[in-house]
Curated annotation (Swiss-Prot):
Purpose of the protein: Protein adapter involved in piRNA-directed transposon methylation by connecting PIWIL4-piRNA and DNA methylation machineries. The PIWIL4-piRNA pathway plays a central role during spermatogenesis by directing transposon DNA methylation and silencing, thereby preventing their mobilization, which is essential for the germline integrity.
GO BP term, pick one: cell differentiation
Keywords: Differentiation, Nucleus, RNA-mediated gene silencing, Spermatogenesis
Compositionally biased region (Basic residues): 118-130
Name recorded for this polypeptide: piRNA-mediated silencing protein C19orf84 homolog
Record note on disruption phenotype: Mice are viable and healthy but show male sterility due to defects in spermatogenesis. Male mice display atrophic testes and the absence of spermatozoa in the epididymis. Transposons are derepressed due to DNA demethylation.
Biased composition (Low complexity): 26-38
Gene assigned in the entry: Gm52993
Subcellular locations according to the entry: Nucleus, Nucleoplasm
Compositional bias annotation for Basic and acidic residues: 139-150
Organism name: Mus musculus
Keyword Nucleus: yes
Major subcellular location class: nucleus
InterPro entries xrefs: C19orf84
Length: 185
């Protein structure tokens, strides 16, 4: 049994982790890197014993998250405490190939597009604003058609289209339907 394990280790098939404090990784485990890049810092140069230089320490994820967050927050606070760069204090400093954009107004989206807000359907708003919006968005003809449809019963939607009489074959005429559709839309 020991011979099988020794054979697997010598072939490089077993990639299990070495236990902490024992032998280090074999250089054949990462064949793509040259040996000079594998161990640029010798553990003895750091002033530590060789066994402590490659110790794996288990850490909980919430603890690691806290440590990383604290380090990032400390870096951010340090950056905020430094004096600002002198080049950002000059508002006229512009790179030659950039164009300054005017500041965005409250009714503009990114890129300078105008933002049209739909009317509120909440309490205290009249229906007149909705018609103004519909007229500006879809043209006066559609707004008038909508007003005619709403003038009937309250809550009544558009009336159903009239049924066309069947032709000689007992089928509806295709030409009549397409003309009505084009007129509506």
């Amino acid at each position: 049994m020991d011979e099988l394990e020794d054979g697997a280790l010598s072939n490089g098939d077993n990639l299990s982790l070495p236990s902490a404090g024992t032998e280090s990784w074999p250089t054949s485990a990462t064949p793509g890197l040259p040996p000079s890049l594998l161990s640029t810092l010798d553990p003895t140069h750091l002033g530590l014993p060789e066994q402590l230089a490659s110790v794996t320490v288990p850490i909980r994820l919430d603890t690691l998250s806290y440590l990383l967050h604290s380090a990032l927050l400390g870096t951010y606070n340090l950056q905020q405490s430094l004096p600002p760069c002198s080049c950002t204090a000059q508002p006229s400093h512009i790179w030659p190939d950039t164009v300054r954009r005017p500041p965005r107004r409250s009714g503009q989206a990114r890129g300078g597009w105008e933002v049209r807000r739909r009317p509120s359907r909440g309490w205290g708003r009249g229906r007149g604003r909705g018609r103004v919006w519909a007229q500006s968005q879809r043209g006066p003809e559609r707004a008038e058609e909508r007003e005619r449809n709403m003038a009937g019963e309250p809550g009544a939607g558009p009336s159903t289209p009239p049924v066309t009489p069947p032709s000689q074959d007992g089928q509806k005429e295709a030409g009549g339907l397409s003309e009505d559709w084009e007129a509506d839309y």
